Amino acid sequence: MNNDSFSSFKFRRPSSKLHKDPPGYGSRALNSQQSTTSLKRHPSAPVYPRSSAAGSREHLRTRSNAYGSSSSSLDQNSAGASPVLGSSDSGHFHSSHSSRSRPPYSGRFSLNDQSSDELIGAPFDSRGMLSALEEHTAEPDNRSYQPPDPAERYTEKPPNFRSQTTPNPRALRQSASFTTLPPRMEAFPNAAGNDRPTNTKRFSDEATPVRPPGPSRSKKSSFSSFVNSMLGSPRGIKISAPENPVHVTHVGYDNQTGQFTGLPKEWQRLLQESGITQKEQEEHPQTMVDIMRFYEKNARGDDEVWHKFDHAYPQQPTAASPISQPAGSTTYGTQRTSPPTSPRFPQNHEGSFENPRAPPPIPRAAPIAAHAMSPPLGGLVPNRAPPKPPTAAANLVPSRPAPQPPTSSPYSNISTRPSPETQSPQFSTPPIPETEPLPSESQRSRSNSRTNGAQGPWPSVSPSHYQQQQEQAMAVAQQALANKQLERSRSQRQQQQSPRPDQMPIAQPALPQHAPSPEDVALTQASQTARAAPAARPRQRPRQSNAMDVRARLVAICTPGDPTKLYYNLNKIGQGASGGVFTAYEQHTNNCVAIKQMNLDLQPKKDLIINEILVMKDSKHKNIVNFLDSYLHGLDLWVVMEYMEGGSLTDVVTFNIMSEPQIAAVCRETLNGLQHLHSKGVIHRDIKSDNILLSLDGNIKLTDFGFCAQINDSQNKRNTMVGTPYWMAPEVVTRKEYGRKVDIWSLGIMAIEMIEGEPPYLTESPLRALYLIATNGTPKIKDEHNLSPVFKDFLHFALRVDPEKRASAHDLLKHPFMNLCAPLNHLSPLVKAARISRAQEKAQKGGV
């Protein structure tokens, strides 16, 4: 059929079909077996694939009211003519295509099951079918059949034929291949050629019974709803608000009653024992809340700064330091104003062997149990051991616990407390999580951060993922630095240098000599790098690395050899929690040295030992205690240092009255040491008289680097609470960011020590001291009128509350007060007098 005849047929046929009166068949005609015009598909009609029909939105049956029976009229195996298409049309269809072979594209083009079900009981709608066919069988020129408006198609409503028969499962189903426009079939491509044999199967889905309507569909939808409800849908997820939330600790202040609300019992007791009056609490309510939160955070955990004031066994990490005695203790009963009894050597647990001054009287606090875990105020009397930083600051070099004076060892600074592995100024140790408690005094390992190692001192965010990142950064950043440290160690031990065995037995008393293996070197480098790596917002810090890791790192930095064969005539001058301090003489030079022996198994913070060694190794200066060497001897670590026989400045200020020129000389030497540390990016953070050592000649040197922290360009401020409370700068107490200027404030407080014999607020409890530092700012000086104007001006610049306005070490070294400095040998008489007074005090107490 050519295009012209087809076009005329396309536009003429619907009109003749739709305007023709429907045949006058009754419902019985549909069931007649003699019907010659069946709706079965003609053998030559093409079969289209189910997939193309199923994917088409248009291929849906249109419901009609023409049939009201429960099954479609097309499902009846009737021989009668179609009620809509006359017999003439059917005859035309047969005549046109009886001789034409079936197109090769024989995939069945039928309605999906759902559409099939919808057709059941619906009348045959030729208009909807034609629309679907036109959509799928359109020719390349996009010509499509546009059915006339329904108003023009139907001039008479077709009769409502109703079938009285039951559906036959094998009956013909409505198929998109049924059409009255055979030419359209030619629009489909002939993929296999026109000579493809015709498929003799007339009904492509004969074997598939028609799905019965009714309950089965509702069951299916119900089942689907049930499955969806069980599996859940992303869109349906709803997160409810928390139920019955409970705020365990929420402190507030009631302005009407002037009372704090929600105070835990421990806080209430601390406030009662602190000596802070109700009026003071009402005047600065927010400051009180901040201090209590600060105090609570630092008073918990196994390395608390406040626990260093408690009475507890030193080996217990969470226990408070046994140093502080109950209120009635004779140890602290006397004021430091009486030289014979006031200066007190810290107990063994205090890592440093300096002579701390007598602790302040306990404000109306009842004597505290020796092993109290909570730090009652009375037990908080500081032994002058600096606290460890609680919060995580990037690149924080952990500081070891503050010095503890054992017997009268001037090396309290070489305290047996675990010397932190403070990195050399170039290293920055991993930051300590903000939640990390300050070190207890007994531990004196006040290390803020763990040694860097594979197990990293930092908190693991996603612990494993963060740790991996840190370890990767570790191995690269500090390669050169680690080599530098190793070379320095070798150069210092040239005389004793000997080949080391491959392995070093841990349990043997003598340290076998063995060169660090590549693994050890890599581990050391990794640990150093870890310190330099910036820390993410720290969660709680991980458990400290095991003893084997620490030993491996120590092996890499310690000198091989047996120290017992290198030093002789050891004389114990002090005792710490985990070891003692000895004087000894070197075999080849007969020089007197100080040796700090530490039992690694007794160190609460083994990682911190490396911190101090590294800082001292890299800080060679005339005003910094000289680190000589370190050895591993069995289970002990021996740290050999320069011996400062004069002891600490604490004894000098306790038993003597110093003149301004002498004070100026001490300040100048201290500032020189600080300037050197600051130039390397290191903050000491624990400057006080206990950490200033003197020789008999009056030479002055800084010691106790356990609290040192690393700062750099990217992290030039810290916000961790470190140092002993009485020497803390206001920005540290209020937990603001701070930098090098905190050492300048501590120097100013130490100058007041040299004037008055003790720092401000020493007779106050630590909690009240924190309150006074935060609220008063620059402390008042007794008898300030007796000071020279130049000295007052020096103190004014050193004790500025605003760190931005506070002078630097470089500025103070140029201050006119430095012109008053006395020669260092003028300090020698003070040192000797202090030694005599100390010996007398010890004799009165029965000798220690």
UniProtKB/Swiss-Prot annotation:
<dbReference type="InterPro" id="IPR008271">
    <property type="entry name" value="Ser/Thr_kinase_AS"/>
</dbReference>
<keyword id="KW-0808">Transferase</keyword>
<feature type="compositionally biased region" description="Polar residues">
    <location>
        <begin position="63"/>
        <end position="80"/>
    </location>
</feature>
<dbReference type="InterPro" id="IPR036936">
    <property type="entry name" value="CRIB_dom_sf"/>
</dbReference>
<feature type="compositionally biased region" description="Polar residues">
    <location>
        <begin position="315"/>
        <end position="339"/>
    </location>
</feature>
<feature type="binding site">
    <location>
        <begin position="573"/>
        <end position="581"/>
    </location>
    <ligand>
        <name>ATP</name>
    </ligand>
</feature>
<dbReference type="GO" id="GO:0000131">
    <property type="term" value="C:incipient cellular bud site"/>
</dbReference>
<feature type="compositionally biased region" description="Polar residues">
    <location>
        <begin position="29"/>
        <end position="38"/>
    </location>
</feature>
<keyword id="KW-0589">Pheromone response</keyword>
<feature type="region of interest" description="Disordered">
    <location>
        <begin position="1"/>
        <end position="227"/>
    </location>
</feature>
<dbReference type="InterPro" id="IPR011009">
    <property type="entry name" value="Kinase-like_dom_sf"/>
</dbReference>
<dbReference type="InterPro" id="IPR051931">
    <property type="entry name" value="PAK3-like"/>
</dbReference>
<feature type="compositionally biased region" description="Basic and acidic residues">
    <location>
        <begin position="133"/>
        <end position="142"/>
    </location>
</feature>
<protein>
    <recommendedName>
        <fullName>Serine/threonine-protein kinase ste20</fullName>
        <ecNumber>2.7.11.1</ecNumber>
    </recommendedName>
</protein>
<dbReference type="GO" id="GO:0106310">
    <property type="term" value="F:protein serine kinase activity"/>
</dbReference>
<keyword id="KW-0963">Cytoplasm</keyword>
<dbReference type="GO" id="GO:0007124">
    <property type="term" value="P:pseudohyphal growth"/>
</dbReference>
<keyword id="KW-0547">Nucleotide-binding</keyword>
<dbReference type="GO" id="GO:0007232">
    <property type="term" value="P:osmosensory signaling pathway via Sho1 osmosensor"/>
</dbReference>
<dbReference type="GO" id="GO:2000910">
    <property type="term" value="P:negative regulation of sterol import"/>
</dbReference>
<dbReference type="GO" id="GO:0007121">
    <property type="term" value="P:bipolar cellular bud site selection"/>
</dbReference>
<dbReference type="GO" id="GO:0004674">
    <property type="term" value="F:protein serine/threonine kinase activity"/>
</dbReference>
<feature type="compositionally biased region" description="Polar residues">
    <location>
        <begin position="409"/>
        <end position="427"/>
    </location>
</feature>
<dbReference type="InterPro" id="IPR000095">
    <property type="entry name" value="CRIB_dom"/>
</dbReference>
<dbReference type="GO" id="GO:0043065">
    <property type="term" value="P:positive regulation of apoptotic process"/>
</dbReference>
<feature type="compositionally biased region" description="Low complexity">
    <location>
        <begin position="101"/>
        <end position="110"/>
    </location>
</feature>
<dbReference type="GO" id="GO:0000750">
    <property type="term" value="P:pheromone-dependent signal transduction involved in conjugation with cellular fusion"/>
</dbReference>
<dbReference type="GO" id="GO:0001403">
    <property type="term" value="P:invasive growth in response to glucose limitation"/>
</dbReference>
<keyword id="KW-0418">Kinase</keyword>
<dbReference type="Pfam" id="PF00786">
    <property type="entry name" value="PBD"/>
</dbReference>
<dbReference type="GO" id="GO:0044025">
    <property type="term" value="F:histone H2BS14 kinase activity"/>
</dbReference>
<dbReference type="InterPro" id="IPR033923">
    <property type="entry name" value="PAK_BD"/>
</dbReference>
<dbReference type="GO" id="GO:0007118">
    <property type="term" value="P:budding cell apical bud growth"/>
</dbReference>
<dbReference type="InterPro" id="IPR017441">
    <property type="entry name" value="Protein_kinase_ATP_BS"/>
</dbReference>
<dbReference type="GO" id="GO:0010629">
    <property type="term" value="P:negative regulation of gene expression"/>
</dbReference>
<dbReference type="GO" id="GO:0034063">
    <property type="term" value="P:stress granule assembly"/>
</dbReference>
<dbReference type="GO" id="GO:0005737">
    <property type="term" value="C:cytoplasm"/>
</dbReference>
<dbReference type="GO" id="GO:0035376">
    <property type="term" value="P:sterol import"/>
</dbReference>
<feature type="compositionally biased region" description="Low complexity">
    <location>
        <begin position="524"/>
        <end position="537"/>
    </location>
</feature>
<dbReference type="GO" id="GO:0005634">
    <property type="term" value="C:nucleus"/>
</dbReference>
<comment type="function">
    <text>MAP4K component of the MAPK pathway required for the mating pheromone response and the regulation of cell polarity and cell cycle.</text>
</comment>
<dbReference type="InterPro" id="IPR000719">
    <property type="entry name" value="Prot_kinase_dom"/>
</dbReference>
